[in-house]
Amino acid sequence: EFFDRNDFGIASFTIDPLNDTPMVLKQYSERLNVKSPNWHFLTGKIDDVYELSNSGFNIFSGVNPAVAGGFEHQGFFALIDKNGYIRSRRDANGNPIVYYLGITSSGASEQGIDMIKEDIIKLLNNGWI
């Protein structure tokens, strides 16, 4: 619902950069029927990808030969404002909820999807994105 806005974008980072070449990611975006020029599917050197995920966003991703596919990740979304800061909301106790849950392995939408949409609207309305 935000894709017609020039002040909103999505960056999706692969956690399997050895296999997810730019061509593979392009095909993936086509399978998802992504039409927005503001949704970017990104890859890079494996060490850089995991460094960005683990140290930049503090969202775990890494190689694990013991799991299906050989790698694992937390599957969270981070909401980043136009200044590069991670934005968050607070829970009932006033603690920050930094990341949003997305889609479960069964494909069910999590409450986090609704939460991130609400927070995107707040940031857009206040000029923070």
Regions found by a protein language model. Name each.
Residues 1, 34-39, 65-68, 102-105:
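Glycine-rich loops and low-complexity Gly/Arg-rich segments
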Residues 66-129:
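Thiol-/selenol-based redox modules, centered on thioredoxin-like
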Residues 10, 26, 62-65, 101:
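Sparse, context-dependent recognition of short Cys/His-centered cofactor- or disulfide-binding micro-motifs
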Residues 28-31, 37-48, 54, 58-64, ...:
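Soluble extramembrane regions of membrane proteins in the secretory/endomembrane system
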Residues 1, 32, 53-61, 120-128:
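Sec/Tat-exported extracytoplasmic proteins
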Residues 1-52:
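Structural microenvironment flanking redox-active thiols in thiol-disulfide oxidoreductases
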